[in-house]
Structures are given as structure tokens and as C-alpha cells.
Amino acid sequence: MRRLGIPKNQTRIKDKENDFYSTDPQAVFDLLRYEKFQHHITEPSCGNGNIAEVLKHEGYQVDAFDIADRGYGYQKDFFSCKDELEGDVIMNPPYAFAREHIVHALQYMKDDSKLCALLKIQFLESLKRRDLFEKYPLTHMYVFRRRANVYQNDNRSLGISNVCYCWFVWVKGYKGEPTIRWVD
């Protein structure tokens, strides 16, 4: 069985700088229509703050940080967090290290805490993620009927994405099959 490992820090920083896709705030508002969260939320790949700002606007207390300084939150390597995470986790992780972000969050979350990650639908594919889904079964998946916009390096001039993004939701300790829901 493949080890649920973490890549070396310098590689993560270099790749993270080139793997930044900001989240359209509407995708967060859409998630909040379907999911309720604990008052405290950790956002470990906050980028320019689009997710965190929506959550704060909706009354949540947000701990927002990122491995790269993008002018929002504070700079911190999520993999250096070794204490139990408070509350739920919502993130749009760098795709190259999405699996590692998810595993790390689930390892340090309290039971029954929720993790939501905005990812390409293709994240379901791949033998290298099989162990993730077996050890930590998905609870829900929210598939956007219309494309959710993400912006490479926050460049909105590139227009609408042609990639299908989904909210992947885990509840730590959940055992069972996931539900798939569509977001209008």
C-alpha cells in the first residue's frame, strides 16, 4: 500500500507558486446553501482570501493562511501544523498537492469535523488516491451544473473555466457511501 506521504517543503513552495487558482466567491456561497459549519473554520490555502472573505461575511471566524504570501492571511506551511485543528476546514488546495492537503487535514481534525475541498471532478480518478477514499470515505459531493470559475493566478480575463469543479466533503469518522448533489 502506498504511504500517505508529504512532499518536501521547497518543492511545495515552488509548485504552489505556479499552482494558484483563486476561487470565485459564488462557489463558496453555493456551498453555504447546502452545508452548515462550526463557528471556527481553518482555510489553509487561502490565496487572495476569496473563500475566507465569504465565510467572514457570513459570520464565521476564519483562520486563513497560505504557504505563499499572496497578500491575505498570514504565511504558514499547512504541513507544519501538528496540533489538532479547531473547527471545520474549507479549502481550494493546490491541485498538485490536493491529496496531501486532504490527508493532513483529516489526520489533525476532530471526529465529526467537516472538510470541504474545491477540486476538479477528475480527483475521483487515479489509483494513487484509492487509499485516500478507502481510509476516508467521502460524505457528499456537490457538482456544479454550470462551471464554477477558478482563476489561474487570479487572472479573471481568461474567462470561464472549461473544467468541472466540485465541492468534495468529508466528515471525519464517516463510514458509508457518498451522496452526489448538483448545484444550480
For each predicted feature, which ranges?
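Class I S-adenosyl-L-methionine-dependent methyltransferase catalytic core
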Residues: 1-184
